[in-house]
Amino acid sequence: MHERYVPADVEAAAQGDWRAADAYKTKEDSQKPKFYCVSMLPYPSGKLHMGHVRNYTINDVMYRYLRMNGYNTLMPMGWDAFGMPAENAAMANGVPPAKWTYDNIDYMKGQMQSMGLAIDWSREIATCKPDYYKWNQWLFLKMLEKGIAYKKTGTVNWDPVDQTVLANEQVIDGRGWRSGALVEKREIPMYYLRITQYADELLNDLDGLGWPERVKIMQQNWIGKSFGVNFGFPYELDGEQKLLRVFTTRADTIMGVTFCAIAAEHPLATRLAQDKPELLAFIEECKRGGVAEADVATMEKKGVATGFSVKHPLTGEPVEVWIGNYVLMSYGEGAVMGVPGHDERDFAFAKKYDLPIRQVIASEGQTYSLDAWQEWYGDKETAVCVNSGKYDGLRYAEAVDAVAADLKAGGFGDKQVTWRLRDWGVSRQRYWGTPIPIIHCPSCGDVPVPEQDLPVVLPEDLVPDGSGNPLAKSEAFLNCTCPKCGAAAKRETDTMDTFVDSSWYFSRYTAPDAETMVDARTDYWMPMDQYIGGIEHAILHLLYSRFWTKVMRDLGLVKFGEPAKNLLTQGMVLNETYYREDAAGKKTWYNPLDVTVTHDDKGRPVGATLNADGQPVVLGGIEKMSKSKNNGVDPQLLIDQYGADTARLFTMFAAPPEQQLEWSGAGVEGASRFLRRVWSFGYGNREALAARAGFDAATLGDADKALRREIYSVLKQADFDYQRLQYNTVVSAAMKMLNAIDGAKGATPAVLRETYGVLLRVLYPVVPHVTFELWKTLGYADEFGALLDAPWPKVDEAALEQAEIELVLQVNGKVRGALKVAKDASRDAIEAAAVADEAFAKFSDGKPAKKIVVVPGRLVNIVV
């Protein structure tokens, strides 16, 4: 054993032992309770960041603690390897996305291995490998058979210069991110999955999940179950009687309708624009810019009057129809009723275009004014109908019922439940993704690829150039024969949304070598007992994976309907930021390692200079580590300097897992110093610790009893904290243990060995390398087996027993000392000891005790 703790040597030795023993390869075992813990698989971007380190360490700590407690634990890893960043990198570097992706996987896998993670690498998957995405294609075809997958036209962002479809995030201020061209909206055929068919189940099943309430609320809002009324405004056009249908949750305000707005893509807008160039021009303008709902919510609301009116279904009054750029064809009916008196967006629109505003609800004590919008105008809790004829005086629920009944009686509509959730469009006009297994035949139309011909393999040697999908130019991929008639045909060149890849990978981990999508092993491991990932995945990934799981269940592939019982959303890792701003307002950000900070006498930062030139930089505050703010810390540099155990210890100690973690160089140094103390104690007491002498607890001296009492008392709390995932206080407990052991005077070697062994096991899940080596070197492995599977230490309840207890001694309510009495001392004995104590004699001024108050186990107060 070396005197000095050298992390690189210790970690290399431990990892060598683990590799030799294939320590983390896991099999099903019906004799043990199972625990399946999964970190959301990473995108292979090139390097791990500190957020990865924190996530995977949390998972690893959980794995190791539960394995020591007798669980059959599994921690797999894979790569979410398809996606747009690989295409962008390919264009920038002139290499195929496949090469960029596989190179990154190799590097990041090496980084993970250097962290000492308990990953079963035999289960590794990469979603860009044909043996994985074959099953994306297979399940897609099954969903097509069941009508869950279907094809319809959808609106996309089109870059007219690059001749390609853009994702919403590639549209910046209405322009293509590469070309700078004004983006257009285009309608193209795409495949969708009927997630709306599962809306009720997705909503209701949230109640049974051990997920953060915040995440469940986000999903509830995204699913967006609404109770309202679907009805139509009648009109006549081209000799036909029709209804302009809308949905509203505020039917109580129907008498306040002064206009209707329709989407630019609405069939009525198309018809009305046939002979009106100004309408056609506005429709074309609406087609430029992004199609994201968020873009629509923040952009300037514009409209144009069509000169056409529909009729109010209850009054028969004409209602003017406008085309509005804020109305989305993909939501609701593509039309909305305009109630400017009681909807903030409609109010602003009406003020802009001088449309009538009508008050039809009122709240007691409030005065309505057209001058400016007030929050209560949209209130439905306390409001009653006014200026609404027969509905006057009705409150919200009563008014909705009455209006719905009248609309139904008139044949215009009825109550309806609607959902904010929309079917999942899975077609992407991109190369680096799962090919959609469809063949286009001139005679047979769209033909599914036969199951025996799966997978449709994506060529990995193409290099995107930004001008359209490379698959459309690859004759080898594109040309095929129709499986129905044998004629020459073309393959579908769209690929699947990468959220498909991440919707079921955790099930494939359980049976990575299966010749079917999943097998019986999947029902052994799934659902995940613990899923770990960032809050940014609260909606799309987690919702899609829940939907995908339910589809797999309904197809008879699995027996469970939810992918994860419990979810932990770890907090972000934050760091200081520093920048300079030029005359044009552009900020240049500097890494904290390149900056020297000055502090005041209270340790608060008051200034900073750039090391390169000694000139000032601005303190930007603490923000999430990111490339854009250049405030990241390279985990590899940290591991190279301090070792993986120090990185792990700091990330677990600095904050509870679910809270934000503020980076601290001093905190990292403190973690390293603590591990050196653990090692130093082991080295300095190696002979005493290695001696396997037993002891009789009943005959131990006071020093031994006190040490055991302290260690087992702290162990009790540490065990509880492990169970509730409060790993920061587990580390605090270990620090208390080391202080107690290191400071124990007169403790025997046997008790030191026992208590130090407890410390090593408590620390092991957090810092596995140093504890593993100390455990082996000091002979614990010979007695208990390798630390990987050593039994978790049990609290010796007898050691917690005390013959004497200490009570606070007060005189007239003020603390004057401490009183030691027998644990089972009677009240009379406690009172006698109190008045006999020196503290009473000193602070009672010779006065006798009038009253003695005894609070059992806590204090004695003598009143004089």
Swiss-Prot record:
It is an enzyme of class 6 (ligase). Keywords: Aminoacyl-tRNA synthetase, ATP-binding, Cytoplasm, Ligase, Nucleotide-binding, Protein biosynthesis. It is found in: Cytoplasm. ATP binds at K627. The keyword Transmembrane helix does not apply. CDD domains: Anticodon_Ia_Leu_BEm, LeuRS_core. It comes from the Bacteria. It catalyses: tRNA(Leu) + L-leucine + ATP = L-leucyl-tRNA(Leu) + AMP + diphosphate. This is Leucine--tRNA ligase. The lineage of its organism: Bacteria, Pseudomonadati, Pseudomonadota, Betaproteobacteria, Burkholderiales.
